[in-house]
Amino acid sequence: MNIKIIGVGKLKEKYLKQGIAEYAKRLGTFCKFQIVEVPDEKAPEKLSPAEMEGVKEKEGERILAKIKDKEYVYALAIEGKERSSEEFAKELEDLGTYGTSDITFVIGGSLGLSPEVLKRANTKISFGRFTLPHQLMRMVLAEQIYRGFMINAGRPYHK
C-alpha cells in the first residue's frame, strides 16, 4: 500500500520534522509512506473574500497536480466526518482489502482547501472542531495512520 500526505507549505519546525520522520520510519513496516509539500501562495495579511478564494484556487491547482486518477483521496476538512481510531483503522483495512493501493491525504493551507480539491476527494475526514496549525496536522495524521496499521495488526500500541 502507498500512503501519501500532501501538505501546503514547507515544514520548518525541527520538532515536527523529527516527529514525522519517526512515524515515517515506523510506517515503513506497513506501507510506502511519503509527505509531499506544495508551495503555499504568498498573500498579504488582510484579504478580501475573492482574494482568499484565489489563494485557495492556486494552492488547489498545485495539490491536484500531485494526485493521480487512481488514488483514493481523503481531504482533511472541518466539515468532514469524524471517526474513532478503530473506525479509521477499519477503513484503511477495507480499502486495502478491496484493491485500493494508493491512498492520499490532503491538508490545506491556512485558508483551507479549494472547492476543486474537496470535489476530487473520495471522502472528507475531520479531526474535530479544533483549529490546529496545518503543519502540526501532518504529524497528528501520520500518527493516526500508524495507529490504524497497529490496530489492524493486533499490536499493543493502541490502548
Curated annotation (Swiss-Prot):
Lineage top rank: taxon: Bacteria
Keywords for the protein's UniProt record, in alphabetical order: Cytoplasm, Methyltransferase, rRNA processing, S-adenosyl-L-methionine, Transferase
EC main group: transferase
Compartment list: Cytoplasm
Residues annotated for S-adenosyl-L-methionine binding in this entry: 76, 108
A molecular function (GO) term: rRNA (pseudouridine-N3-)-methyltransferase activity
EC number: 2.1.1.177
Listed transmembrane segments: none
Reactions listed under catalytic activity: pseudouridine(1915) in 23S rRNA + S-adenosyl-L-methionine = N(3)-methylpseudouridine(1915) in 23S rRNA + S-adenosyl-L-homocysteine + H(+)
Main location: cytoplasm
One cellular component term from this protein's GO annotations in UniProt: cytoplasm
Assembly description: Homodimer.
Protein family (similarity comment): Belongs to the RNA methyltransferase RlmH family.
HAMAP family to which the protein is assigned, alphabetical: 23SrRNA_methyltr_H
Biological role stated in the UniProt entry: Specifically methylates the pseudouridine at position 1915 (m3Psi1915) in 23S rRNA.
Protein name per its UniProtKB record: Ribosomal RNA large subunit methyltransferase H
Lineage of the species this protein comes from: Bacteria, Bacillati, Bacillota, Bacilli, Lactobacillales
